[in-house]
């Protein structure tokens, strides 16, 4: 090969490889930007739906502990000029959602399903039903579920299997009975269970004792007897039992 041709060919090959690398990187960046824009639009729409239902949300920078939020919280991520330019939805993640005791609404159900970063979900009154739990999609991020004074029954507890990492579950003032307690065996990470003012009785002791990671259970206002509570303490000596 002519000595003058070889360097030119080498430069051409380097240019081709550099151009190919540039195109690959540009394609990846474009794909990421499109995904980020879609996620931001989805979160913005979800927030609007929740707020229109008189619901409340908190963001990741509000978290001050595993299940505590402080306001205004830590400084949100990202430089302020870029947040102003793009919008907070590109940086912030919703980690807490609370919905009031209104009837089940498809808009807010979709909104919650569109927020995969939610760690704690609170459904009050009519917003917490067997049907609403059935329509919530599977989430490995959800750690806490509060269903205070909701319409949840034994049938609804079957859907808790969709939340395998659930650590805190509140079922006080619900329709839950002994028949539904067996469904809790699917929650191997459960640490705290609030059953106050339900119809749970001593018949649920085997199901409760089977929750190996459980650290606290509140049985006040239930049909569990003092003898039954003592049996739980004997079978699970590290479990704090409130009765």
Regions found by a protein language model. Give the residues of each.
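Hydrophobic membrane-insertion alpha-helices, especially the h-region
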Residues: 20-35
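Hydrophobic anchor residues at the C-terminal helix/turn of individual leucine-rich repeat
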Residues: 109-112, 133-136, 157-160, 181-184, ...
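Alpha-helical transmembrane signal-anchor/signal-peptide segments
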Residues: 40-55
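N-terminal Lys/Arg-rich, disordered targeting/topogenic segments
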Residues: 1-13
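The leucine-rich repeat
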Residues: 107-108, 129-132, 153-156, 177-180, ...
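Leucine-rich repeat
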Residues: 89-95, 114-120, 137-144, 161-168, ...
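LRR N-terminal entry segment and analogous cap-like coil->beta motifs
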Residues: 52-155, 167-168
